[in-house]
């Protein structure tokens, strides 16, 4: 078979630079053809054929509607919808419903682009670049998205959670400027580590970070919806969660966040000495045993006292026993249990979004948008290491310095 390699043919072939436009044009032609075939099947005849004199089928073509733009994930195309008259019911294409201006895939893409830290003016620019200058988008489309997120959030916030086998909880609050309030509102957030190794967003509710009552309300609500007692809760020492935990889940063990503690201690050290102090401090939570962590703590405090930094030495002592709780859990899980990074990492995306949160007049609107952001981030949450050990932890296995303590097989004689 010979190929036509004439200059005219070669010039008409798409290049890498024009490939997307070539593909869009092909899709546009194909979809226009499908629209025509829909009408042919409905009327039982081709565009140029006359109606049969024997039992003619009702209905006839009546030109085309106005050109319609349809946003696809690879750009925007223009289609002409055939019009049909003389039918008892209005003809509506299954391929292109009357008011549909974008595909379902683009509908899914819109909230993700909007939520990934784009201000509204940049959001519009980004979509124009992706979907083409003719993309049919409007402020009303974004408003409908926000309303849909609010409705989704309300359903999600009342869902049963009894099917979740929760082992660990990470808790924290993020402050956002929302509404007309003078003070920033906090979004109290709970992320759960499950027996299968997944991490999931469990609760996102507005409230005060240090409020025992606010955290108690969250825990009571989760308990009423089926949450069982977690084995360990990780959070900042200043949170009201600890008083709430004593009220609702007193059996749960507590781990204070090392990131917050190190920052608090360094605040008591002059800037010119912080580099050396940080080097000594960061070694403490990475000690292989609790005993070594205790020694490194004493070494740091001795370093502080030589430099008359009593406040820093004392700050490290605060709530010390709850800084070491993670040693009573599998060593494979320590990476996850030392800090609240599990919450703070996805909030890095949230903070991009909340730089513009002051335009939200209501805290509820900010809550819904941030919740949606976290739910998107949840898809890429890192799974817990050694998930096979989570069932042991859930069943009450004891660990010392990260190693499981075997139950005594023989009873000691009385």
Regions found by a protein language model. Give the residues of each.
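Mobile genetic element proteins and their domesticated derivatives, centered on retroelements
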Residues: 35, 39, 74, 86, ...
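Short, conserved DNA-binding cores of transcription-related domains
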Residues: 2-97, 177
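RNase H-like nuclease fold core
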Residues: 76-88, 92-101, 105, 131-234, ...
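Acidic/histidine-rich catalytic cores and adjacent linkers
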Residues: 1-10, 14, 37-40, 45, ...
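Short, amphipathic alpha-helical "recognition" segments used to contact nucleic acids or chromatin
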Residues: 105-117
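DNA-recognition alpha helix
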Residues: 121-133
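Metal-dependent DNA phosphodiester-chemistry modules and their immediately adjacent helices/loops
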Residues: 79, 90, 265-301
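Conserved beta-strand -> loop -> alpha-helix junction used to position metal-binding or nucleic-acid-contacting
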Residues: 232-239, 244-280
